[in-house]
Amino acid sequence: MLVTQEYLEREHMKYIIMAGGTYENWEKPKHLSEVCGEPIVARTIRLLRENGVTDIAISTTNVRAFLGFGVTILRHHNPYTLPKDADASTPWLDAFYPMTEPVCYIFGDVVFSPRAIKTIVETDTGSIEFFASAKPLPSIYPKHWAEPFAFKVKDTSRFFKAIKDTNKFDKQGLFKRQPIAWELWQVIKGTPLNKVDYTNYTVINDYTCDIDEPEDIAYFDRILKTSD
């Protein structure tokens, strides 16, 4: 569906860039890391605005660090912590700022291509849509596995009920790992929980990907110089 400015005004939706959590491999919030001289969150904001989006916010615990980007800052306690040399033991699903109105949650540590943001903005949903990469992955993609990028949510009641259900299923031991975006999407879809299901979502397959380590920045510096 081609989304016009009239559509954006009629079907109003807030876009929240999720920039919470603590990542001990990073000296500052990794969402503020610069790619080609531009902070990742600033790049995402710019690309959203280039696609007609005006209602943009950043959700974070570290409010002061994210001032100055010209968008609303939503204080949100996200206890998720990723240690330097261990897996996270705190819940990832607390990352979503509570909303009752339509919202698009954009993962704040993802370096998006212009086409990726355009796809997210122009994809309509009557309920909930999920955006991620998928195998077979393109050669320009920096990893060997798929990564999640965003949730677009019209039915917020259903979305937050799914989060509660996912946490409940986790306590019952129905997942093989701590639930993250993939497991949440399985609960939303109603598919079996004992195997991660990388299907039935809007696929974005280009260089769009999140950053895990400081060394990832150099890769995107090289890619963006020739791709954008």
Identify the residue ranges that each predicted region occupies.
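N-terminal nucleotide-binding beta1-loop-alpha1 segment
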Residues: 2-28
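Short, polar loop motifs at secondary-structure junctions
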Residues: 59-65
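C-terminal catalytic/acceptor-binding lobe
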Residues: 199-228
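Hydrophobic targeting segments
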Residues: 14-18, 41, 56
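A short, N-terminal amphipathic alpha-helix
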Residues: 39-53
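Short acidic/polar active-site loop segments enriched in Thr and Asp
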Residues: 54-55, 101
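Conserved core of the sugar-phosphate nucleotidyltransferase
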Residues: 112-205
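Short phosphate-binding loop-to-helix
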Residues: 68-104, 111-114
